[in-house]
């Protein structure tokens, strides 16, 4: 039936798992009694998406309102908020359309839904790639701030920041289009996974180096005041906790999704991998949770931004 075809297509290239072959000896739904499938209610999924949408819209509004926040660092944070906003919107839109399909409301529009599916998939993939890129850009920006403080404004200029932002958005559109067009190509999946792993390594190295530099700086200051141990230990624990939250939330929210892509390449027919495939909606939910956490880590810790956010909220009332 056309409606069934459209609905299957709407599930998207992103969560498409390779079909089982007659030679595998494994039925499509046979994963063993030990397989745990976490069911995510549509209401919860939509609610998280709406929370992320509102939260990131507030970040964008606050940065747009306050001219003091019109700097490269906040431009990157604003673009991260836009990317996270698009992640939420696209996933919420896809879920809403699927619910309408299941209810039969869009049965007469199957052809339009198929075209909408392509646009939504590109939207989802592009926003994910751009979100990851801007997380990396923020890490690089903070690294330059600490290690090249005196030269920061000559290195990270507004024109260069705008070029970097434009390049990231353009690359995200190209990557998402290629991924949706060639989602069944092993090389494309491996490129995405490699990109994620490279970004994890980059962020870990940069932030750990920044933490080491901060501890060394605190040690130097504490020696001058002859109270090295308590100050150094306190800063080290606080920095380690911040680093753990930053990298931990990033890996926890994004790791399962890229594990899913990796297993599609490595073991598409294995029962254990098939069990992982069943939890794809959980992985998307974790990515939306990351869109909720990002403003808390990168935006709302700024006193200036929080002050502007209060003004935005008061004006809205």
UniProtKB/Swiss-Prot annotation:
GO terms for cellular component: plasma membrane. Keywords: Cell membrane, Extinct organism protein, G-protein coupled receptor, Glycoprotein, Lipoprotein, Membrane, Palmitate, Receptor, Transducer, Transmembrane, Transmembrane helix. Residues 1-37, 94-118, 184-191, 267-279 are extracellular. Its main location: membrane. Residues 1-28 are annotated as: Disordered. The keyword Phosphoprotein does not apply. GO terms for molecular function: melanocyte-stimulating hormone receptor activity. It is found in: Cell membrane. Coiled coil: none annotated. A lipid is attached at residue 315 (S-palmitoyl cysteine). Pfam families: 7tm_1 (PF00001). SMART domains: 7TM_GPCR_Srsx (SM01381). Glycans are attached at residue 29. The chain crosses the membrane at residues 38-63, 73-93, 119-140, 164-183, 192-211, 241-266, 280-300. Signal peptide: none annotated. Receptor for MSH (alpha, beta and gamma) and ACTH. The activity of this receptor is mediated by G proteins which activate adenylate cyclase. Mediates melanogenesis, the production of eumelanin (black/brown) and phaeomelanin (red/yellow), via regulation of cAMP signaling in melanocytes. PANTHER family: G-PROTEIN COUPLED RECEPTOR. Interacts with MGRN1, but does not undergo MGRN1-mediated ubiquitination; this interaction competes with GNAS-binding and thus inhibits agonist-induced cAMP production. Interacts with OPN3; the interaction results in a decrease in MC1R-mediated cAMP signaling and ultimately a decrease in melanin production in melanocytes. This is Melanocyte-stimulating hormone receptor. The lineage of its organism: Eukaryota, Metazoa, Chordata, Craniata, Vertebrata. The gene is MC1R.
